[in-house]
Structure formats: structure tokens, C-alpha cells
Amino acid sequence: MCGIVGYAGKKNAESVLVVGLICLEYRGYDSAGIAVLDQGDILVRKSKGKIKDLEAYLREFPAPGNVGIGHTRWATHGEPNQINAHPHTDTNSTVAVVHNGIIENYLELKSQLKKKGHVFQSLTDTEVLPHLLEESKKNGKSNKDSFLELFGKIHGKWAISSVFETEPDRVYFAQDGAPLLIGKGKGEYFLASDISPLTRNCEEVYYVNSGEWGYFSQNEFKLFDFSGKELNPTFKKQELRWEDLDKGGYPHYMIKEIHEQAGIFRKIIQERILENSEIVFPEIKLSKDVLSRVNRIIIQAAGTSYYAGMIGKHYLENFAKIQTDTEASSEFRYRNPVVEGDTLIMGISQSGETADTLASIHEAKAKFIKVVSLVNNVNSTIARESDSYIRTDAGPEIGVASTKAFTAQVLNLLLFSIYMANLKWLISDEEQKILIEEIKLLPAKIDRILAQASKIEEMSSHFTTAKDFIFLGRTYNHPVAMEGALKLKEISYIHASGYAGGEFKHGPIALITNEVPVVCIAPKSEIYTKMVSNIQEIKARKGIIISIVTEGDQEAKSLSDYCFEIPECSEILSPILNVIPLQLLAYYSAIARGCPPDQPRNLAKSVTVE
């Protein structure tokens, strides 16, 4: 959600911070700002809107200096405007603070500070932080001690960075439940909410753990725990290339990432499947003996990852015969679920920082339940705090609406299900070999779908004024219908709902008119005739039918107003192929309606608040 950057070195801090904020744009934001230390003064520059608006402001009011912090804000408290934008300062602008997360007790703290004469300018929870630091300094505390004292006063999950005018060469930082990284360059240090701003200049990085704080200057870095004990951090080599974050000639990250899916599948298949069709997960630390005893799996996820988990439930129950429940992380943690020793919690998160999923993992570990997470960022908090993790291996995903991470999650869940079936002796070598051979054909089939993207582009041009969409699917493709609806409303702002085909007559059919497009996912399968019945019901009520069918299909195609054919495959693999035209439909609908597909309004790539 919010993005934090910081810098101390020889370069112009304003330029470094702005470039860093641009790298964090994909996380979602509504305002941006920086604070730069200049000869003992803190120069705060911030604006509502995009980074380009901040850059325009900086051309008029530059912020010279070599040390500073910056922030992109995604509003949680107070509307998006310049006053509520970060950084925030104390009464006399002696300290500036940027913050990601939520201060849950800010109203109580604000009331206490007002009684002591503090005057607040914004409606944010963040503004209490510089005033708390100011109050500590009034009581004779040093900058360092004031910063440390702050952590015991605030409740919630957060990351903070601060600069003081009396220490013009130093940047302070801390985190308790929200991600922060330190980057080490040549005679300079960087701070960021994720790896993307650090790829150009940093040779090594350190992932700050929850409950750690510290400070850095041009040539100094110190790290402590919340008790004040000094720590000895180990920096890791930074391996992500700047080119990995480039659009690669595509107009948007989303369409680039859609087109990367075949290559990602080739990579996963090559790394996960041996020549003898054996499936390997070398990163899983839990023993095969422990995994073979698992008799229940609870999948925790949010958004698109939740729908991937729903497909994973089908796979795990079908192949490994393990009772599997898929739950929204935000709901699981607020009840008292019945779990036993041989239950496995599986958290799914692209970023590895999803706040609700992380909280659910903490809940599971408090009950002594083993956790294996499926994450795209193996250095993330969720990966570090799980007993083990599985690499999604989708590569950096910058577009806010997840595409390639979704299909990579589904493929990994399928392979993990076969792996678990093998541990439990529930699949023969021959059965596994046949299935693996079909999986190996997926990349070429994805390429064939993407080669027909222009058909979806033309189709989407007919629905620029549509106000509602309905998506229908059954069994494995019910979650695909829900994911297709989510994608469309996320980036084209068209209201859309996804339903199980069997539930259509139980309410949603009342919405059908000649102005409502209905996407029917109807590949050849055991329940194909049921989907054809849905299509006939829609046609009888003059609904607009868009069908996704298997190549060569005539029955469903003849009943449809628009049709897109996917290569033939088993029902088990059909979700992977069926979702790709829905991703394209969402993308081209957004373009046709003039919506920004990479930065849809109100959305954040990494949801780090609960």
C-alpha cells in the first residue's frame, strides 16, 4: 500500500527519492511527498495526485540536500490531499516522519497530545508520530531515545522512517509488521518498502525484521531490537535486475505480464519436473514424513490468491484425497477454527506481505500448526515467518491486477497436489506420467491463446458502455469466473460478479436483460451440458452471451453472441487456459474505457494493512 523510501549519501537526495517513489507507484497511491535535510533545515515537499505532480512542485520549490525520506500515500485516514500527504512534521518542523500501516490508538494519543498544547494540521493517524517525538524531546530525550520510546506508545502494524534537523546526516527507521529493506551502495545507504527502488544502486540488501529499528548515514549503519540491544545484520546479495522491472516494449505492465505466462510455465516445469516425471519442491523444509501425515489443509489467502486457493482445493482433494478448506484470511483469524496436529495451513500471497494472511499465519502458529506458504517473494515476511514456503516463481509482478502470479500459483498448487498424492501412494507412476506430459503442453497452448489476443481486443470494444457483467463457471472454473469478474471490475471499473453455474437460477438470473453481457466458461468436460443449459437460459432471456469454449465446439458456440476458443485440454488444466482470455478482456476493456490498467483507482498492489 503506502511506499517508503530513504537515502543518505553524496547524490542529490531529491532525485534519488523521486526515482524511488516512481518505482513504488505500482503499489497504489493518491499523493506523494519527500523531506530533505538541507543545512540543518527540513524541506518538506508534497502534493496530491501522481509523482509527476510532485515533480512539477519540486521544479518550482526544489529541495537540495543529500539526506532525506519519501512516501507514496494510499489513504486510510483522511481524504487524499496535500495536507494529509506525508511526510508529517512536529509543531516547529524539527522532525519529519513517513509511515506505512495503521496506528490503531491514534485518537487516544491525539487527545493526550492536544491537552499538552499540540496542534494538528491533518486528519491522518501518522501525524501523532512527529508530535510524540517532539514531546519526548521536550522531556530531555535524545533523538535516538525518543525514537525508541515511540514504539511502546503506538499500537498496530507499521513501518516508520524519520529525520531530525539536529542530525542532518542520519535517517531513522523501524518496522513492526510492515515491510522495510535497507540497501547498501558505494558510500550510500537506501531505504525502501520493497526491492524495486534498490535494484539500480544497491549491491546488497537487508530485510528488516519485525521488532527491529536503526539508523544510517552515508557510511554508517546501526540496527537494534526494540529492547535497545544492538544487532549484527547480515546483508544479502541483491540479484534482481533493473531490466526485470522494465515494460519491455509493452505499453503497460499488465499486458507484458499476461504475455510472460508461457515463459514462466516453461521455467516452472523445467525446475519442478524431473526427466522421470518426478515432481520436486527442494525449498520445502518440512520432512516428507510430516507431509505424508497431513490429513487436512486450510488455505489462507485474499483477492486473486484466494481464487487460486479455491482451485487448489479441487486439486488437493482430487489427487491427494486431503480435506481442504479455502478461507479468506481476513475472516479466518477472527473466529476460533477447529484445527488438529496433522492440519497444515497454506498461506498464499503474491507479495508475501498481505497483512490479513500474515495475521492468519500468526494465529495458526499460536496453535502450533505447521505453515507452508506459496509466495512470489521468498524474502518476504510471510516466507520468513512460515515453517516453509513454496516459490511461485512468476518473477516480479508490477501491475496492480495480478495475472501471471495467479496462473503460476495454480500450476504450483497442481504440482504440489500431485506431489502430496505421491507421498501418500495415491497416484501410480503411469497416471502421473500421463498428467505430466499434458502439463508440459501448457506453455505452447498459452502461446496459441495469446496469439489471438486481437480477437479479445475487438470483442471488448463492444462493451465500453456496459454497466454490469456476469461470469459463470462450474467446478474447477467456478473460481475462474470469480477471478474474471474481479479483474474486470478492478481495472475497467465495470461492476461484475462471478457465480457457480448451478447457482445461477437461485437469484442471479433475475439480473439478465439484453444489456447484460454474461461470460460463460464452457470447456469440454463432464459438466459441459450443464453449462450449455445455462447458456440456453440466458439466451431465452435475451442476455448477451460471451462463451469460452474448447476448439471445435459447435453447440455452445452456435448459441453465443461472442465466442473465444481455447486449445483442447483436460478439465483439470482448463482453469489455467480459460483465465487468460478473461485477463485480456479486462485489460482491453480498461484501455477502451480510458482506464489506467497498471494503476487502477483506490487499489494497492500489496495490502499491508488489515
Curated annotation (Swiss-Prot):
The keyword Magnesium does not apply. It catalyses: D-fructose 6-phosphate + L-glutamine = D-glucosamine 6-phosphate + L-glutamate. InterPro entries: GATase_2_dom, GFAT, GFAT_N, GlmS/AgaS_SIS, GlmS/FrlB_SIS, Ntn_hydrolases_N, SIS_dom, SIS_dom_sf. The active site is at C2 (nucleophile), K605 (for fru-6p isomerization activity). Its EC number is 2.6.1.16. It comes from the Bacteria. GO terms for molecular function: carbohydrate derivative binding; glutamine-fructose-6-phosphate transaminase (isomerizing) activity. Keywords: Aminotransferase, Cytoplasm, Glutamine amidotransferase, Repeat, Transferase. One of its GO terms (biological process) is carbohydrate metabolic process. Residues 287-431, 459-600 form the SIS domain. PROSITE patterns: GATASE_TYPE_2, SIS. Its main location: cytoplasm. It is an enzyme of class 2 (transferase). It is found in: Cytoplasm. CDD domains: GFAT, SIS_GlmS_GlmD_1, SIS_GlmS_GlmD_2. Residues 2-219 form the Glutamine amidotransferase type-2 domain. One of its GO terms (cellular component) is cytosol. Catalyzes the first step in hexosamine metabolism, converting fructose-6P into glucosamine-6P using glutamine as a nitrogen source. Homodimer. This is Glutamine--fructose-6-phosphate aminotransferase [isomerizing]. It comes from Leptospira interrogans serogroup Icterohaemorrhagiae serovar Lai (strain 56601). The gene is glmS.
